[in-house]
Every structure is written in C-alpha cells, then in structure tokens.
Swiss-Prot record:
Annotated catalysed reactions: (6S)-5,6,7,8-tetrahydrofolate + formate + ATP = (6R)-10-formyltetrahydrofolate + ADP + phosphate
Gene label: fhs
Protein EC: 6.3.4.3
MF GO annotations: ATP binding; formate-tetrahydrofolate ligase activity
Keywords: ATP-binding, Ligase, Nucleotide-binding, One-carbon metabolism
BP-aspect Gene Ontology terms: tetrahydrofolate interconversion
PROSITE patterns: FTHFS_1, FTHFS_2
Keyword presence, Magnesium: no
Protein name per the record: Formate--tetrahydrofolate ligase
Positions of ATP binding: T65, P66, A67, G68, E69, G70, K71, S72
Species per Swiss-Prot/TrEMBL record: Staphylococcus aureus (strain MSSA476)
InterPro entries the record matches: Formate_THF_ligase, Formate_THF_ligase_CS, P-loop_NTPase
Domain of life per record: Bacteria
C-alpha cells in the first residue's frame, strides 16, 4: 500500500480563509494582521483577557529515536480530537528551524492527517520571526564590536565576550571564527563563534516575554561579556535595548494558522529543548488560554528535557499549572531502548519492547514528580504488531497508568478520540502541580536535583571552569535563577549511547552560561553543541522546487 507523503497530504488539503479560523475562536478582524490568505499575526492588545483561562495540556515523549516519535503529530491530532468532540480548543506549537529541516528531521509541523498548514510556509520562512530574531542577535554583535572599535568606553574585555552571532542553519564550520581581521579599519580582532538561532538568548527572551515592555526589560538585562576586572556588561550599558526590541516588534506577535481539520493553531517561537528551554512562547500559550477552553501544547524531546523546562522555567514564569501531560511512546522507540539496532526496528520483537519499557516508565514517573497525572499515547506506526501494542497496554494497566492507542497520523482527529477522552478525565480532576525545585536553592543543588531525580544519575561533577563560574555567578547575584540543562536528547545521561533507564551514572557539567536576560543559567553537559552540524546525507538532498514554485521532499 502506497502512503501519501506529508507534503502531498498537505497540498491536497483545503484551507479555510484565516479570518474564518480567527472568527471560530472569537478573534475580531481588527486584531488580525493577515500574511496572505492563510496566515496571520495577532495583535494581543486587542484580545480580551479571560478570568477563567483555558486549561493547558502538555505533550512530551519518551527518549526519542533520531527520527522523533511524532510528538508534534500527536499534539495536533489531540487538538483535532478535542475539536471532533466539540470542545473549544487551540493548539500551540513551536516554529520549525531551517537547520533541522535541511538536516536530519525534515519539516516539523506534524505528520499525516495531523498537520498544521500551510506546511511549506511554516517550515521555510513562515512570517519572518526567525529572521527578526537572527537580525536582532547579530545587530547586538555589531553594536558590541563597534563599541570596542570606537574607543571601548565601557572597558569591555574582548577576550571575555560571551555573546555570539547566530544563523538559522546547521553549520559546524562557524562554531569558532575570528572577526575584525584586515587591519585597523575593520575593527578589533577577536575570537567569536556562531550558535544556531534557536539557541539564541533573544529567542528565549521572545518566548518568555509577556509584552513589548517586558521584552525590552529582558533584553536590557542580557550579559554580553565582562570588563577587564571581570564585572558584567549588559545591553543596558550599551543602551541599545530599544533598537533591538524595535527589530522584534512584529516577531513578538503570535502567528495564527490551522490544522488540516480547521483547528486554530498558534505557532510561535522555537527554542530547542536540548540546548535551550524547548517551549513555544508564553504569549502564544496565554493568548490561546484567553480564547479557548483547552490549549494543547508541546515541549521538545522527552520529559527529561522539554517537559522539565516547561515545568521549572515556562510554567513558573507564566504562572499557570498544566492540567494534564501526555507522554508519547512508540513501539520502535521502546524496541530501540530494548537493544534493537536501527535497521531491525520494523521487525516484531515483544521481548525488546519489554526491555525498553523501563525508559517509558521513568518518563511517566518524572511527570508524577511534578504533581500532574500522565497519560501515555502509543503513537501507532504501520509496522507495529498487535502483540507489541498489547504488551504496552498490559504494562500500563498493571501499573495504573492511563493509556490510549493513537492513530492520528492515519485518521486525523478521529484517531485521537480515545486519547482525548482519557485526557478529559484528567483535566477535570484537581492536581498538585509544583516545580521540581525552589529558586532559592543554590545553582549546584538545582542541577543535582535534576540529575538525581529526573535523569536517575547518582552524582554531578563540575569541571574546574564550571566551579569558577559557580563562584562568579553567586558573586554576581545570579544564584536564584532556574537552570536550563543542555544535554543529549537520546539518553537520560550525558552519553547518547546509554539507552533505556540507566542509573548510577555521573553527569559532568563542563561549562555554565548566564542568560540573565531570559532569566536562567544554562548548564552544558557532555559534548552537546549549540551549533549543530549536518549529517553525511542531509534531508536537503531529497528536496527541490517545481517550475511553478511548489516544494518537493519537504518531509
């Protein structure tokens, strides 16, 4: 049987005019800023806040295979299922980054019959938010280098500039560069480097801001580097926060699109969860809560990364409690964690599913530690067998875990009704949500709590550089920030080959980064990179554009 590609399905779908999608959730035309017929930005100042805001359902996953486990697909499909049940629902997603689109994963707008549209636009340039973020980030780099070139009144030590340039592409050759070469007219030579745009602090700030004023305040607090006597230098010292916020004045507005089934979707912001906080914008989530009774959103990778940061950073900053959490599992990921090689994942292997269930079990238990009841969604793939699925269901029943087989890729919203009904039962019950740690804990204790309670590790080792940074950060008054762990998504540990549910391992913190604008401290583990590289055969090799301007091979 031949299956249509995601792009073919998207191209065969009939989109509703964006003004009709907006009207379905009470967005007036004067609050809508259309970008063509099927996309728009929303003027949040023209949305009336609700007293009884919508309930937030978070979708996370077990530790993924390199291809991903369909978290975005389940997120969209679950929202469509609520729509099918006549619930007032919106879905809130992150924007895809071009780097992974051309790299290993292809597009990131869901899949099959559970997609947000227009898929081509969203995956490529969308409404220009990433370009604005990239421009603001690199404008700050230009302002820093110009300040040094023009006399360096602030006494910035060019050896201790923390701010890097960014690009929305996987490009390992740009990790370490020299700038200012070519003589005195070209600036002061120094070492620099590039991160991917989704790792930019500007991206994190946009996603954690509540208004333009809040955006400007957060930008002003960015630490760009240090003086020669090691005092922090901020954007406020450079006096360019207004200019940077101006570049972002449209990017801060949430983007409205739709699913194949016409469910309204806000797609806004896109930090990675392995190197940043991995959640869409607070503004999009809160706008959806003002418009809908249920908001389905996602956080990147597994509960150890995106979900932990959603709870400890985003929900804490926004001041809401998630009403339920869906943990996406796949038979292929369970088999991978049970020791099956990538080439054999399509073959039935119930014993491997049994061995790999420990990974899912830890993710389920992690969610319970935040005081929220998890619901497992088995995202169905065509190679799954009845015996494999039945084992997972029996495990769930034995352990009193809610579970539903989810077939939204093939059937759209109808394939997610069982999952939606399970989630509805959970959100109708009170929960006891609480973040994992108190902000008053010292930074090293917050990190240890995440490593021991969420990852299952036994010990944290800090490099000599990280130890010096801990001391310096305390002296600078940065000890009360939450922690954003930068770690491989493939394992609970910092070794991506250690699958399943390892325990007793040590995590090494090699370096810390102070994101004082966004308001968190990044702890870098293992060999994690903030500028990824492309694989030997990037997804770009399968992409093209027709003579009439339509994309080919975009997932």
């Amino acid at each position: 049987m031949t299956h249509l590609s995601d792009l073919d399905i998207a191209n065969q779908s009939t989109l509703q005019p964006i003004k009709d999608i907006a009207a379905s959730v009470g967005i007036s035309e004067d609050a809508l800023e259309p970008y063509g017929h099927y996309k728009a930005k929303i003027d949040i100042n023209k949305i009336t806040p609700r007293e009884n805001k919508g309930k937030v359902v978070l979708v996370t996953a077990m530790s993924p295979t390199p291809a991903g486990e369909g978290k975005s697909t389940v997120t969209v499909g679950l929202a469509d299922a609520f729509h099918e049940l006549n619930k007032n629902v919106m879905v809130a997603l992150r924007e895809p980054a071009l780097g992974p689109t051309f790299g290993i994963k292809g597009g990131a707008t869901g899949g099959g019959y559970a997609q947000v549209l227009p898929m081509e636009d969203i995956n490529l340039h969308f409404n220009g938010d990433f370009h604005a973020i990239t421009t603001a980030n690199n404008a700050l780099s230009a302002f820093i280098d110009n300040h040094i070139h023009q006399g360096n009144e602030l006494g910035i030590d060019q050896r201790r500039i923390e701010w890097k340039r960014v690009l929305d592409m996987n490009d390992r050759a740009l990790r370490h560069v020299n700038v200012g070469l070519g003589g005195p007219t070209n600036g002061v030579p120094r070492e620099d480097g590039f991160n991917i745009t989704v790792a930019s602090e500007i991206m994190a700030i946009l996603c954690l801001s509540r208004s333009i004023k809040d955006l400007k305040d957060k930008i002003s607090r960015i630490t760009i580097g240090y003086t020669r006597d090691r005092k922090p230098v901020t954007v406020a010292d450079l006096k360019v926060q207004g200019a940077l916020a101006m570049i972002l004045k449209d990017a801060i507005k949430p983007n409205l699109v739709q699913s194949i089934e016409g469910t309204p979707a806000l797609v806004h912001g896109g930090p990675f969860a392995n190197i940043a906080h991995g959640c869409n914008s607070i503004l999009a989530t809160e706008t959806a809560r003002d418009l809908a009774d249920i908001v389905v959103t996602e956080a990147g990778f597994g509960s150890d990364l995106g979900a932990e940061k959603f709870m400890d950073i985003k929900a804490r900053e926004a001041g809401f409690d998630p009403a339920a959490v869906v943990v996406v599992a796949t038979i292929r990921a369970l088999k991978m964690h049970g020791g099956v090689a990538k080439d054999n994942l399509k073959e039935e292997n119930v014993e491997a599913v049994k061995a790999g269930i420990v990974n899912l079990e830890r993710h389920v238990n992690n969610i319970k530690k935040f005081g929220v009841e998890p619901v497992v969604a088995i995202n169905a793939f065509i190679h799954d067998t009845d015996a494999e699925v039945e084992y997972v269901k029996s495990w769930a029943k034995e352990n009193n875990v809610r579970i539903a087989l989810t077939e939204v890729w093939e059937k759209g919203g109808k394939g997610g009704v069982d999952l939606a009904n399970e989630v509805l039962e959970v959100i109708d019950q009170p929960n006891s949500f609480k973040p994992l740690y108190e902000l008053e804990l010292p930074l090293e204790q917050k990190i240890e709590k995440i490593v021991t309670e969420i990852y299952g590790g036994s010990k944290v080792t800090f490099s000599s550089k990280a130890q010096k940074q801990l001391k310096q950060f305390k002296e600078n008054g940065w000890d009360n920030y939450p922690v954003c762990m930068a770690k491989t998504q493939y394992s609970f540990s910092d070794d991506q080959t250690l699958l399943g549910a390892p325990s007793g391992f040590e995590i090494t913190i090699r370096e810390l980064e102070a994101k004082t604008g966004a308001g968190f401290i990044v702890a870098l583990t293992g060999a994690i990179m903030t500028m990824p590289g492309l694989p030997k055969k990037p997804a770009a090799l399968n992409m093209d554009v027709t003579d009439d301007g339509h994309a080919i091979g975009l997932f």
